[in-house]
Amino acid sequence: MAWDDVARQDHRRVCARYPSDMTDREWAIIAPLLPPARSGGRPRTVDLRAVMDAILFMASSGCQWRMLPKDFPPRSTVQGYFYAWRDSRLWEALNHLLVMSARELEGREASPTAGVIDSQSVKTTESGGISGYDAGKKINGRKRHIVPDTLGLMLFVLVHAADVQDRDGAPALLQAIRYRFPWLRHIFADGGYAGSKLRDALKGQGDWTIQIIKRSDTAQGFEVLPRRWVVERTLAWLGRCRRLAQDWEKTIESSSAWAFVAGIRLLSRRLARYCYPT
């Protein structure tokens, strides 16, 4: 779809309360994927679109739960849905489904065959929970270990202490991805994943090939490296959500959930723009 005046009019957000609010097209993508109300008991009265808008506002602005604006549903209600969907792994499932839809939209197979792996160390706060010191980045906190496909769509994220080396955290991440994307075989990586340790850890987990893309010894200053720029761009996309500027969460489950929310935000906007014409 061409990004012309008609498309701009369809996707403009000036009528929304906040820039993070979903458009009608984005909600049409997300709504069928949310769980229905439970049978029996008190009928559901809350508007799930308002709940999703509140969660996206939290992700985009990075504000505290207590600072959630009053025109959203009550804070306790929004928190309840966020944690319930975290515990049921709904955020992970939504990201998975939207990735496959976006890939098919681009004319690709739903399950990728190649991906790019990297990690991002971020500081934690006094909230507690698992953390560690990344001596290379000089950061005390956690690592977000991600693998996007070659389009830059985040396939999965694994959060762990920052003192876990990349090659030690990679096997668990790749095993989790293989379960969800069974055709994934080839991984592009930087020098932090070089050596036999990672390859030995992946034995018995499928037919993996790890391609190390190193920076040239003669290069001076900034250099765009083939394939590796894809994962750096994905991390930059996720970084548009200020909730991810630091790791504010006590549990790694919540940390992972917010990363998936950021991915869902990107994917729903992408699909709404190109896949659902009026």
Describe the residue ranges of each PLM region:
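Short alpha-helical elements
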Residues: 1-278
